[in-house]
Regions:
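Active-site gating/metal-coordination segments in enzymes
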Residues: 57-142, 149, 190-197, 201
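Mid-to-C-terminal alpha-helical segments outside catalytic/metal-binding sites
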Residues: 1-4, 29-47, 212-213, 218-224, ...
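Divalent metal-dependent hydrolysis catalytic cores, especially in the metallo-beta-lactamase
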Residues: 22-29, 34-57, 73-81, 101-105, ...
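Short, acidic/polar
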Residues: 30-39, 84-95, 173-174
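Hydrophobic faces of well-ordered beta-strands that scaffold small-molecule active sites
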Residues: 4-8, 48-51, 75-78, 101-105, ...
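Catalytic pocket-lining loop regions of alpha/beta-barrel enzymes
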Residues: 115-224
Length: 274
């Protein structure tokens, strides 16, 4: 069984060579690809989906170089710029020249006064459908209705909701709305960023009911586990971050665990030797 981390970031330790976005705090945590590979080797992790980090903004140079250097280890998800004259132009270049297979859609970057399910969202979803790119949503529960509208208009677009959709334990109505998105057959959910979603300490077992609700609604074949490196290193450590699933879903069958810990993301992105 291959273990694939379905969501993480990498950023350069050389801001002179790969500039950070203005306003990035001084002394940010180490997040380079070589550090990640060391941790993955120790944890028995075979590869990862890299999501373009906000520290580099829309400058994908560092992730481009990482993808080129380690093509068997990593797949890239680009960050869409919804304020660009044509948000799809840069994405097309990243796909064609650097092999990106996904697009992160972050409503927090939308122009003021515009909704994610407006014209820009339509353009991005249509583009993903036409190119085969996977659309990943970094959202909160207040955005579930907009995601539902987009997926209803573009049912052929493969989609992912990151980080449980920011649903926390005890948010029964928000969880109900998240589970309702299972009506879209090509929708997936990342069970990720546990230290932020949880209200308890490692191993964050208060997320168990949420995950089992997702399994019942989506099936484990549409769920994927992720650590959210490098943030997880300071939160609980990479190796312990990878062990979370064994504690919050101890009743998983071997087959279900194969899907959750790598099978789903391997199938969705047709990568890592799938």
């Amino acid at each position: 069984m291959k273990q694939i981390d379905a969501h993480l970031h990498v950023w350069s330790g050389d801001p002179a060579g790969y500039p950070y976005l203005p306003g990035t705090p001084d002394g940010i945590a180490r997040g380079d690809a070589e550090f990640l590979l060391e941790l993955q080797a120790d944890a028995g992790v075979d590869g990862a989906l890299i999501v373009q980090p906000i520290h580099h903004g829309f400058d994908h140079s560092y992730v481009n170089d990482v993808l080129e250097k380690y093509p068997d280890k990593f797949v890239g998800m680009a960050l869409a710029d919804p304020a660009a004259d044509d948000p799809t132009a840069a994405l097309q270049v990243l796909k064609d020249q650097h092999g990106y297979q996904g697009v992160r859609i972050n409503p927090g970057l939308w122009p003021a006064g515009q909704s994610m399910d407006g014209p820009i969202g339509d353009q991005l979803m249509s583009f993903c459908a036409e190119t085969g790119l996977v659309a990943g949503f970094l959202i909160e529960p207040s955005h579930f209705g907009q995601v539902n509208a987009l997926c209803s208009r573009y049912p052929e677009t493969r989609t992912i909701i990151d980080h449980f959709g920011s649903v926390k334990p005890g948010q029964t109505q928000e969880l109900k709305e998240l589970l309702a998105l299972a009506r879209h057959p090509k929708m997936h959910v990342k069970v990720s960023r546990f230290p932020v979603s949880s209200e308890s300490e490692w191993p964050y077992t208060d997320m168990s009911d949420t995950i089992h609700g997702l399994i019942d609604a989506f099936g484990v074949e549409r769920l994927m586990f992720a650590t959210d490196f490098p943030h997880v290193v300071a939160q609980c450590g990479y190796a312990r971050g990878w062990q979370i699933a064994d504690h919050v879903t101890p009743s998983l069958t071997d087959e279900q665990r194969v899907w959750l810990m790598g099978g789903t993301v391997m199938k969705l992105f047709n990568a890592w030797g799938n």
